[in-house]
Amino acid sequence: MNIGILGTGHYLPTNVVTNNDLEKIVDTNDEWIRTRTGIRERRLATEEVDTSDMAFHAALGALEEANLAAEDIDLILVATVTPNTSFPSVACIIQDQLGAKNAAAMDVSAACAGFMYGLITAKQFIDTGAYKHVLVVGAEKLSKITDWSDRTTCVLFGDGAGAAVVGEVGEGKGILSFELGANGAGAKELYLNHDDHIIMNGREVYKFAVRQMPDSTVNVIEQLGLSRDDVDYLVPHQANIRIMEAARERLGISEDKMAKSIEKFGNNSSASIPMALSEAVKEGKIKDNDLIVLVGFGGGLTWGAVALRWGK
């Protein structure tokens, strides 16, 4: 069975926060932020908007593109580190909002690599024959766990959600290879402290990311007997432009073949890859039969990469 992505969707809060806005609350400026992160603005959800609200809207878009009803979904997986509350899961909340009465539902926690973990979990469930259609969502309200007095981290993060419907696709299409990994020895480099604020060792995370993203990309390509020259489009975790560019240059992939939503969206953790993917699809940057690589890394430390042939 060939299993791939039938539809994508993403949602952004309407509240735009520019670098100039951040100058008013921390000691920073637009040039400092842009040169170090590539970010010009990010979207922040208002207090009354929950992670589940953003996940719901992204899911609607993915269902519409897949031409499926909510009742057609057998399982909902939501990757998030910012659920509304510890429980119930965001997946259960949007199951009700969507009217997906036939779906099981659970959240996945693998930080910025969460969508990759969710996507491969969806594939494995479908491979068994137990389920036919799985909705995978990455959704984050990072603004609620950001320390707005820490200029090294508060400039990075934004809120939003991205979604994909996974199911059977045509011959030669869909997910062709994948890699998932973790190294718990690096847990202290990126974590949520007891004050519910993100703590990051930027230097160590950078060193890890610029090594792991290219290595994982090469691994999933070589599993197919192909080379990096065969990649039509790369969708990396939108962490930081310096990390993304360093990884791209190591891979020798041209700039026009890499998704860059970070300038407008910021770093959206587990939502960043599905948001960037959905935007690229909507803008026509990804075409039928393209070989796509999705690759990300996150706290844990965790990482994941997926190679897929685009199309239904």
Swiss-Prot record:
Pathway: Lipid metabolism; fatty acid biosynthesis
Renumbered residue ranges of the record's region ACP-binding: 238-242
Keyword annotations from UniProtKB, A to Z: Acyltransferase, Cytoplasm, Fatty acid biosynthesis, Fatty acid metabolism, Lipid biosynthesis, Lipid metabolism, Multifunctional enzyme, Transferase
Principal location: cytoplasm
Active site residues per record: 112, 237, 267
GO biological process, one term: fatty acid biosynthetic process
Statement: the UniProt record of this protein carries the keyword Cytoplasm: yes
EC number: 2.3.1.180
GO CC annotation: cytoplasm
InterPro entries tied to this protein: ACP_syn_III_C (IPR013747), ACP_syn_III_N (IPR013751), FabH (IPR004655), Thiolase-like (IPR016039)
A GO term for molecular function: 3-oxoacyl-[acyl-carrier-protein] synthase activity
Cellular localisation: Cytoplasm
Catalytic activity of the protein: malonyl-[ACP] + acetyl-CoA + H(+) = 3-oxobutanoyl-[ACP] + CO2 + CoA
Family designation: Belongs to the thiolase-like superfamily. FabH family.
UniProt cross-references to NCBIfam families, sorted A to Z: fabH, PRK09352.1
Domain topic, free-text comment: The last Arg residue of the ACP-binding site is essential for the weak association between ACP/AcpP and FabH.
Free-text function comment from the UniProt entry: Catalyzes the condensation reaction of fatty acid synthesis by the addition to an acyl acceptor of two carbons from malonyl-ACP. Catalyzes the first condensation reaction which initiates fatty acid synthesis and may therefore play a role in governing the total rate of fatty acid production. Possesses both acetoacetyl-ACP synthase and acetyl transacylase activities. Its substrate specificity determines the biosynthesis of branched-chain and/or straight-chain of fatty acids.
Subunit structure: Homodimer.
HAMAP family (alphabetical): FabH
Protein name, per record: Beta-ketoacyl-[acyl-carrier-protein] synthase III
Species whose genome carries this gene: Oceanobacillus iheyensis (strain DSM 14371 / CIP 107618 / JCM 11309 / KCTC 3954 / HTE831)
Organism placement in taxonomy: Bacteria, Bacillati, Bacillota, Bacilli, Bacillales
